Amino acid sequence: MIQQESQLKVADNTGAKKVKCFKVLGGSRRRYATVGDIIVCSVRDVEPDSSIKKGDVVKAVIVRTRRDILRKDGSSLRFDTNSCVIIDEKGNPKGTRIFGPIAREIRDRGFVKISSLAPEVI
């Protein structure tokens, strides 16, 4: 569960390392976001010589959460970190690589490009 002020790691090669969520999209007073939801973030930490600068406002899709993801078959899934992938206005990832596994719910939500770039879909 991601909410305002939550800090997330960035799981792609755009150059951003950490972002802070300041808006959960999808409703007038929506409080929490989970895997597959879009959030608006501020970049807090970047790698040197990256195209994204500290303080930039970006949209991102959540790909991993520490909170359990409950599935229809009764199983649950949990990751070690809260992570996201930075996207453009059309919903395509800005980076060309994605690091670490992602949840299957990403593909179900329509982010096929992100799931195809990931090394492992759980």
From Swiss-Prot:
GO molecular function, one term: large ribosomal subunit rRNA binding
GO annotation, cellular component aspect: cytosolic large ribosomal subunit
Keywords noted in UniProt: Ribonucleoprotein, Ribosomal protein, RNA-binding, rRNA-binding
Keyword RNA-binding attached: yes
GO biological process: translation
PANTHER family (UniProt xref): 50S/60S RIBOSOMAL PROTEIN L14/L23, LARGE RIBOSOMAL SUBUNIT PROTEIN UL14M
HAMAP family in the cross-refs: Ribosomal_uL14 (MF_01367)
Family: Belongs to the universal ribosomal protein uL14 family.
Free-text function comment from the UniProt entry: Binds to 23S rRNA. Forms part of two intersubunit bridges in the 70S ribosome.
UniProt subunit comment: Part of the 50S ribosomal subunit. Forms a cluster with proteins L3 and L19. In the 70S ribosome, L14 and L19 interact and together make contacts with the 16S rRNA in bridges B5 and B8.
Protein name as catalogued: Large ribosomal subunit protein uL14
